[in-house]
């Protein structure tokens, strides 16, 4: 993969200037990556209606080229290929999903997913396209996509490019939902989502973003909500109303349930999507 920015805005450039790590992740670079995946899928049967799905993937980039250059006597970082710096990193992701049948018309779906990426050798920052983010219709539905993290960090500005630096090298997320039939093709769901992303290395531009075990529970965003699904055989039209319970950053309100005001500007998120979140 080759990444190259053709055109940028003033706001975008300003964000990169204020955050060197993000700027490095967006620079023109060659990503010589290979991925290896393992998938286990125990499909539901008449005797065992509970499905279990597990997928783990390992992605590595730049190691073969780096090894060849090392044997050729080229050492250090910032080495180039085709005129551009090449990325070097390892990235591990894993996702486990279980569906437990409760009755003929209802089930409980649970998901746990995690991942970690580490850049080293030729580069010190993961490419932006390989970094983790959280929130949105298929993640923590009570928070908009890329609106939380890393850690307890919160951008000081509310510009249109503020979401750019809300990514991380580590991701933890868990989701649980009770899905049931209402009538005909209409289905309902009650759900709860939790998780966040973090940085491997400490950055002064994103204070509180690094992963720490101490106080980790405070940095886990938590949301709940309910939704409707309309099944038209080939696709499922979904609407989920997410209700935030705990934000991982300082909201100015004391206590664990620290959402100050509930409204569609803060605290409530309506997600419209096609298909199930997992």
Q: Across the structure, where does each feature detected by a protein language model lie?
A:
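C-terminal outer-membrane beta-barrel translocator/porin domains of Gram-negative envelope proteins
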Residues: 1-180, 190-213
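Short beta-alpha connecting loops at secondary-structure transitions
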Residues: 19, 77-80, 128-129, 208-213, ...
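Strand-connecting loop/turn motifs
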Residues: 49-51, 103-107, 183-185, 232-236, ...
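C-terminal substrate/ligand-recognition segments
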Residues: 175-184, 228-230
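Long, low-complexity, intrinsically disordered polar/charged segments
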Residues: 185-193, 273-278
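C-terminal beta-signal and adjacent terminal beta-strands/loops
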Residues: 194-210, 234, 241-260, 276-278
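A short, conserved beta-to-alpha structural element at the edge of catalytic cores
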Residues: 217-238
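Outer-membrane beta-barrel "beta-signal"
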Residues: 230-234, 264-278
């Amino acid at each position: 993969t080759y990444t190259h920015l053709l055109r940028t805005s003033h706001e975008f450039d300003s964000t990169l200037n204020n955050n060197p790590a993000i700027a490095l992740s967006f620079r023109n670079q060659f990503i010589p990556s290979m991925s290896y995946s393992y998938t286990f899928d125990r499909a539901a049967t008449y005797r065992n209606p509970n499905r279990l799905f597990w997928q783990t993937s390992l992605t590595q980039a730049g190691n073969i080229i780096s090894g060849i250059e090392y044997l050729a006597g080229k050492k250090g970082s910032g080495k180039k290929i085709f005129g551009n710096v090449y990325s070097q990193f390892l990235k591990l992701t894993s996702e486990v999903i279980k569906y437990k049948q409760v009755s003929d018309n209802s089930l409980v779906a649970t998901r746990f997913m995690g991942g970690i990426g580490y850049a080293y050798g030729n580069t010190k920052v993961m490419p932006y396209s390989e970094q983790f983010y959280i929130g949105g219709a298929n993640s923590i539905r009570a928070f908009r996509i890329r609106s939380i993290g890393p850690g307890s960090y919160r951008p000081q500005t509310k510009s249109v490019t503020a979401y750019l630096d809300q990514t991380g090298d580590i991701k933890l997320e868990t989701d649980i939902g009770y899905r049931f039939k209402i009538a005909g093709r209409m289905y309902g769901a009650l759900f709860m989502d939790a998780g966040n992303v973090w940085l491997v290395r400490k950055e002064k531009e994103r204070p509180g973003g690094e992963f720490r075990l101490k106080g980790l529970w405070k940095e886990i965003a938590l949301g709940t909500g309910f939704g409707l699904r309309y099944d038209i055989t080939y696709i499922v039209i979904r609407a989920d109303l997410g209700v935030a319970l705990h934000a991982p950053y300082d909201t100015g309100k004391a206590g664990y349930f620290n959402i100050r005001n509930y409204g569609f500007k803060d605290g409530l998120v309506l997600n419209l999507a096609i298909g199930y979140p997992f």
